[in-house]
Amino acid sequence: MEHSSWHALIKAQLPEGYFGKINQFMEQVYSQGIIYPPKEKVFQALLTTLLEEVKVVILGQDPYHGPGQAQGLSFSVPDSIPAPPSLQNILKELSDDIGVKKSHDLTAWAEQGVLLLNACLTVPAGQANGHAGQIWEPFTDAVIQVVNHLDRPVVFVLWGAYARKKKALVTNPHHLIIESAHPSPLSVYRGFWGSKPFSKANAFLKETGQEPIDWLR
């Protein structure tokens, strides 16, 4: 992370010494039990999607907490792992909106400028939201603020009540916010189905002179 285009700008948004606190937290929790994603993938979203490449931000809450699922990109799992229910619903909405994506590994989105960011970057095995409120939210809020300050228009995709609270951090009128219910089976019928976030994002990117995302990759 230190050598990425993100580092200095995120650091400037945080209190002095906050990166050190994150390192201490990670050393502690990874030494005490099973934590997801693997330590080397905690910052995968920022390493795969460089700041100068960001076109879309899709905000999740925290990583998947089952074996082999989390890979440091919100909602994504490796193709060797069955797609969790929320991801199944995302891919169904994509199919209805644009077409069928055969892979449920979303790395190809990240490589095209889709920042797949979780608000909390680690989770204990089997404990959803187990690290919520401990260290990560100021860091990931800083990431959102760094993107908000870009002159280049960016699409923020906010699914569910938790992500929609982050709308307060997106104050730049150049950007587009797409919000709906969460793709979880518990809430998908409250406005996620038929929300067409993928075609809406691409329409905005084209309008602002940017290459659209190939969501089917």
Curated annotation (Swiss-Prot):
GO MF annotation, one: uracil DNA N-glycosylase activity
SUPFAM superfamilies xrefs: Uracil-DNA glycosylase-like
EC number(s) reported in the record: 3.2.2.27
Catalytic activity: Hydrolyzes single-stranded DNA or mismatched double-stranded DNA and polynucleotides, releasing free uracil
InterPro entries per the UniProt record, alphabetical: UDG_fam1, Ura-DNA_Glyclase_AS, Uracil-DNA_glycosylase-like, Uracil-DNA_glycosylase-like_sf
Main location group: cytoplasm
Function in brief: Excises uracil residues from the DNA which can arise as a result of misincorporation of dUMP residues by DNA polymerase or due to deamination of cytosine.
Catalytic residues identified in the record: D62 (proton acceptor)
Source taxonomy: Bacteria, Bacillati, Bacillota, Bacilli, Lactobacillales
GO biological process, one term: base-excision repair, AP site formation via deaminated base removal
Presence of keyword Phosphoprotein: no
Superkingdom of origin organism: Bacteria
Protein name per the record: Uracil-DNA glycosylase
Family of this protein: Belongs to the uracil-DNA glycosylase (UDG) superfamily. UNG family.
Alphabetical UniProt keywords: Cytoplasm, DNA damage, DNA repair, Hydrolase
Localization: Cytoplasm
Pfam families, A to Z: UDG (PF03167)
GO cellular component terms attached to this protein's record: cytoplasm
